[in-house]
């Protein structure tokens, strides 16, 4: 398990994402050799384990044992998933790009597992129910309230109808 601050979407069709990892990290070698990884969405409930996995090396310990996170099997790749996570994104590395302090691993998304708890009857994922966290400059934050949906800044307001 590695906690990665630098990650994001690269492309939606085909689905791709990236993670950036320092070459001196223990996980860097495993990423390079296996070419596979899982991005596990982390939440407020998992914040302490997330931090632990970011500051302790897996070189001499099993982070699953140390954090009591539940280890599961991925569906399409040979890397473990964190079952406690509401979303597991299985990835296969397409390209490695050395970028100074970090190597960017650009990967194809090969499978996504989502906990049904966070899905509605229409198949929509409700991120706010999962209570994800973000990390910025050494601090973890919860996301809080939704500020708007895509395009809300330009959407025309509906006019009120007058009753006749």
Would you name each region that the model predicts?
Residues 1-164:
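Basic, polyanion-binding surface patches
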